[in-house]
Structures are given as structure tokens and as C-alpha cells.
């Protein structure tokens, strides 16, 4: 079997996910993509990928939490006779509470007299709940959130520290209402998982110190000897290379392995474990050369495969709307080194140029506040713009 493992498959995505999907589509063989993050509505993303022709029918998808739930996480409820999808609807009125429309579509806030005690978000104009927040009357912050899938089934409960927006734990439920996983989170940094409990038949089955060990357990149970496994996420290098099956592990390096002249911490394990790696796929000859300057890895373990883009020949160019600007599109994460882009742009302006820099992306590591601080320090607020993507 040929697998690709990655942490996430977002609906809106940049370079890494785009390159992953194009590689798989180009090969057009029977692939299974395994993801290890939690998402209660993954089937809707798979459907969108197929509608947009990003994957072929040869591609299968599986999520780690789907497997942990014994494949009950994404089970679609059906009506008894026609077997059509069944939607659980929740009235928008709550007895004894005053409701007020929120700023977002489908968002309603509920008040006990003047005290905000609950909020609900519905999917569009339907009566299918997306989430429900329970609000502390003393702090005004939510202390608990219930999340529902597209059919209105509860799939997660999140719990928050008192007087804080930080989450301390969550509980994951299958479509039959059984809790199969409980996770605990650090307060710093970035609310990383620092404890996982797995339940079977309502009894504690296994525990893990973090989600890397959980991913290793998942891979150990899913792979067999001689499976071919592409890994596109550095977070999963250790779980993949520490599982004990004799798999052909192919590590795809989507960005630079260097931070200045030092090897990035996220790359060290993979590059130190070359005996367990079948191939490293790199972007450039220079990247291969740089890696071999630091690690004794043979030439035959490298394969050069640059990223590529598809040109849409049907789109007509409208020169009347051309804007003179640099554009970055991708994740706002530490590994992307957006600060380097901003500093390089600052040097560019010092040469007398006036082209603006526009940054499009999703904040993953709380980078936007740091970016805004740097932009202010360099007095670039009128030249650098940040947009959600």
C-alpha cells in the first residue's frame, strides 16, 4: 500500500498541502492519505477536494481520530425508511432566556436579564447547531463549548480555565454518543497537547504523554512491512521513523532546513535518522548539498522534485487592474520565517523602491502579533498589509 501522512488537510491551503495533492494526483495510483489532527467535518473537505478535481477516485482518506473512534466519528445518520441523511435540529429559542442576534450569520447570544450566559452558532440559516458556548456570569468568558458536526451530532466538548480563554482539555465523541478520547493541553506554548486518554467500551484503554506518541501508536497499527509512506510534515517524522514496521519512508522537505546557518530543530531528527529513511525529496540541488555538509547521507537517498504550479490558460489577463505589489501566500508559522521576508522587504525599500508587500495567510503559531510588532518597529505600516487567506 502507498500512504501519504500529514498533520492536516485544510479546506483553504497553501504550498505544502497544494504540493502534496498535486503530487498524488500526478502519480494517480491507489493512495491513502492519513491525517493526524482533529476535525469533526473532514468528509466535507474530502468532498470539496473531489469537486474541485484536486484528487482522483484512486485516493482514499483516513483520519487518526476516525480510526480511534472505530470508524464511528464520520458515520452519517440516516432516516429510517428512505435512508437519506438525517439532521438533528435545535430550536433557536431557549426558554427563560432573551436572545439577540450576533454579528456573524447564525450566531445568537442569550441573556438572563442583562447577563450573557450562553451563545449558539448555527450552520447558515438552518436549525442545525455548529457549536454552543456556556458563558461564566462573573468573567463573561466561555468555560465550556460543545461542537456539532454538519448533521447536528455532538462530536466534541471543550473545557476552559476560569477567567481565561485558554483550553485545558477536551472530550471527543463518536456519532453514537460515546466518548472515545480525552485530551489535555498545556497553557504554553501554543496550547500543545500534553496528555491523551483513549477509551474503549467506556473504559480507559491507553494513555499517551503527547500527540506524537499517539501518532506513533496509530502508525504502528496501520502500516505493514514494505508499505511505502510519504511524509509531508516534520511533526510526524519521529512517529513515522520510530514505528517498527519495515516501511519505505520517503520524507518530503517542503521548505528550507536552515535557520540562518543552523539546522532547524524540526529537521534534526529526520536528518539524523537517515538509516530509517528510504528517500529524502528536496526542492533544490543546493538544499541537498547543504544537508550533506552537515550529515553523512548518500547521494542515492536524495531525489530532487521542485514544487510546481498549474497555469490556468482560460483566465484572461486584465492589465487595467494590475497592482504593483509583492505577494506572499501561505501559512503564518514559525518555520515560514515571515520575519525574514519583512526584513528583506525593508532593505528593498531602502534602495528607493515603493512596491508594497501583501501577506495572505492563516495564523498558526500566533505569528500575526509578532509580525505587526516588527512592521511597526521598521515603520512599514503603510507598505505592508496582512490579509486572511
Regions found by a protein language model. Give the residues of each.
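Short N-terminal targeting/anchoring amphipathic segment
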Residues: 206-212, 216-236
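Membrane-proximal helix-turn-helix segments that form the acceptor-binding/catalytic region
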Residues: 216-224, 256-280
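A short, histidine- and acid-enriched strand-loop-helix "catalytic/donor-clamping" loop
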Residues: 237-238, 247-265
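Acidic anion/phosphate-binding donor-loop and adjacent secondary structure
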Residues: 260-264, 308-324
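A short, active-site helix/loop in glycosyltransferases that binds the activated sugar's phosphate group
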Residues: 274-302
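Conserved donor-binding/catalytic core segment of Leloir-type glycosyltransferases
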Residues: 317-336, 342-345
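Glycosyltransferase donor-sugar binding loop
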Residues: 356-369
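Nucleotide-activated donor-binding/catalytic signature segment of Leloir-type glycosyltransferases, i.e.
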Residues: 368-389
Amino acid at each position: 500500500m502507498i500512504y501519504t501522512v500529514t498533520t492536516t488537510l485544510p479546506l483553504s491551503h497553501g504550498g505544502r498541502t497544494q504540493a502534496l495533492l498535486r503530487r498524488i494526483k500526478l502519480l494517480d495510483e491507489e493512495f491513502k492519505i492519513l491525517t493526524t489532527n482533529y476535525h469533526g467535518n473532514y468528509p466535507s473537505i474530502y468532498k470539496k477536494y473531489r469537486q474541485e478535481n484536486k484528487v482522483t477516485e484512486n485516493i482514499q482518506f483516513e483520519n487518526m481520530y476516525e480510526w480511534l473512534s472505530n470508524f464511528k466519528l464520520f458515520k452519517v445518520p440516516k432516516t429510517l425508511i428512505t435512508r437519506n441523511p438525517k439532521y438533528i435540529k435545535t430550536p433557536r429559542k431557549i426558554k427563560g432566556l432573551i436572545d439577540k442576534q450576533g454579528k456573524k450569520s447564525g450566531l445568537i447570544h442569550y441573556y438572563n436579564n442583562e447577563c450573557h450566559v450562553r451563545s449558539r452558532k448555527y450552520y447558515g440559516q438552518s436549525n442545525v447547531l455548529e457549536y454552543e458556548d456556556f458563558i461564566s456570569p462573573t468573567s463573561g468568558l466561555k468555560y465550556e463549548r460543545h461542537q456539532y458536526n454538519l448533521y447536528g451530532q455532538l462530536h466534541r466538548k471543550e473545557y476552559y480555565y476560569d477567567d481565561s480563554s485558554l483550553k485545558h482539555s477536551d472530550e471527543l465523541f463518536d456519532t453514537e454518543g460515546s466518548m472515545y478520547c480525552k485530551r489535555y493541553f498545556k497553557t504554553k506554548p501554543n496550547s500543545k497537547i500534553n496528555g491523551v486518554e483513549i477509551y474503549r467500551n467506556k473504559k480507559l484503554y491507553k494513555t499517551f504523554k503527547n500527540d506524537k506518541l499517539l501518532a506513533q501508536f496509530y502508525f504502528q497499527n496501520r502500516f505493514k512491512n514494505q508499505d511505502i509512506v510519504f511524509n509531508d510534515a516534520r511533526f510526524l517524522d519521529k512517529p513515522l521513523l520510530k514505528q517498527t514496521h519495515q516501511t519505505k519512508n520517503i520524507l518530503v522537505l517542503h521548505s528550507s532546513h536552515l535557520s540562518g546557518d543552523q539546522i532547524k530543530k524540526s529537521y534534526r531528527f529526520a536528518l539524523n535518522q537517515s538509516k530509517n529513511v528510504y528517500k529524502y525529496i528536496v526542492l533544490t540541488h543546493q538544499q541537498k548539498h547543504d544537508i550533506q555538509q552537515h550529515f553523512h547521507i548518500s547521494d542515492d537517498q536524495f531525489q530532487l522534485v521542485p514544487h510546481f504550479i498549474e497555469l490556468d490558460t482560460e483566465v484572461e489577463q486584465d492589465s487595467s487592474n494590475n497592482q504593483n505589489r509583492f505577494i506572499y501566500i501561505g501559512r503564518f508559522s514559525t518555520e515560514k520565517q515571515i520575519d525574514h521576508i519583512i526584513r528583506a522587504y525593508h532593505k528593498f525599500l531602502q534602495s528607493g523602491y515603493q512596491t508594497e508587500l501583501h501577506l495572505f495567510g492563516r495564523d498558526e503559531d500566533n505569528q500575526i502579533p509578532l509580525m505587526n510588532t516588527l512592521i511597526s518597529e521598521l515603520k512599514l505600516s503603510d507598505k505592508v498589509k496582512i490579509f486572511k487567506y
